[in-house]
Design a protein with these regions (language model features):
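Short alpha-helical interface patches
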Residues: 14, 287-294
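Polar helix-capping/helix-linker motif
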Residues: 30, 117-118, 275, 279, ...
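Low-complexity, Gly/Ser/Thr/Pro-rich intrinsically disordered linker/tail segments
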Residues: 263-266, 280-282
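Extended boundary segments
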Residues: 264, 271-274
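Glycine-rich loop-to-alpha-helix module at the N-terminal edge of alpha/beta enzyme cores
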Residues: 293-302
Length: 302
């Protein structure tokens, strides 16, 4: 803070969502941090992200109204899908992300559209992060139409499609490059980052898989154009705020009680065994359930 360093809290796993927001707001609520501008990342492939953006906007509005500085939210699509799939499969949980790439792309545009207004950018400035030229053009035009050029900047990954980055920098006036830095003696911590970049370049549903053929191959261009238009056609600003995919609630289960088994042993034996899903600590109700159990331990006789 004293040296003018900008701190941005990144978002990795779904389980970090609530914790990262809580840490971010708690630190910036400290009196000596009220004038410090920091940032946080939200991943559009999580249905939870629009609601999280709205909660951050409400918090930031109060912060600015009381004399504090605004903050920054970096909007990304999300690059940890494989990890989220593994996590869900291992623990018996619902997948945290949207069911399709198109749904993620639609939510990305909805988050930008919701946040990119003069009233809201007074509290939160935006980082539009991504490599998709159609999405960058969408955000660029939306930024101009809403008159919020000074509150929205574009961000791309350093080293990926550098020719495109030069064009984006020239046309938008500014480009922030996301650069990973790691101690050479701890290079293993960068492996997951490199794997995600390889996956982005190889997966056919990702824009980067055809980026080098975009100008010369009409089919590739049409494919990406049609994907963009399909996601845009699903955009409904007035639709209800998406709810999380995971709804496990041990607290509600405890209050409702365990239903009595009414079937016979023979009937149960015909059904395949399905293990009870692990309790998900990423969910607020489950965390409260765990706290209640811990609080009851000193006086428990069982």
């Amino acid at each position: 803070r004293d040296h003018g360093t900008f701190l941005n809290l990144d978002m990795e796993d779904y389980k970090d969502l609530d914790l990262t927001i809580a840490v971010f707001t708690a630190i910036l609520d400290q009196e000596d941090m009220r004038g410090y501008e920091a940032g946080i990342v939200l991943q559009a492939y999580l249905p939870d992200s629009l609601g999280a953006m709205q909660r951050l906007q409400e918090w930031a509005a109060k912060r600015v109204a009381s004399g504090g500085s605004r903050v920054k939210v970096r909007i990304v699509k999300g690059a940890n899908l494989s990890m989220e799939k593994v996590d869900a499969e291992i623990h018996g949980w619902e997948l945290t992300t949207w069911p399709s790439k198109q749904a993620t792309d639609t939510n990305y545009k909805r988050m930008l559209s919701w946040a990119m207004t003069p009233e809201r950018t007074r509290n939160i400035r935006l980082g539009v992060a991504g490599q998709n030229l159609f999405d960058i053009a969408f955000a660029f035009e939306l930024r101009a139409a809403r008159g919020v050029e000074d509150s929205v900047e574009f961000e791309m990954l350093s080293g990926m499609a550098t020719g495109i980055q030069e064009v984006v920098r020239r046309d938008t006036g500014h480009l922030l490059l996301y650069v990973p830095v790691v101690d050479p003696h701890e290079f293993d911590v960068a492996i997951s980052y490199l794997v995600r970049r390889l996956e982005e370049n190889a997966a056919p549903e990702n824009f980067m898989s055809g980026v080098f053929d975009l100008a010369s191959n009409e089919q590739i261009f049409a494919r990406e154009r049609d994907r963009f238009l399909a996601a845009l056609s699903d955009l409904d600003p007035d639709a209800p705020v998406p709810v999380p995919n995971r709804t496990q609630n041990r607290l509600a289960e405890r209050e409702a009680g365990i239903p009595e088994e009414t079937g016979t042993v023979a009937e149960r034996a015909k059904r395949p065994f399905v293990s009870e899903a692990d309790s998900d600590p990423a969910l607020a109700a489950n965390r409260q359930w765990a706290r209640d159990i811990a609080a009851a331990i000193p006086g428990s006789t069982r």
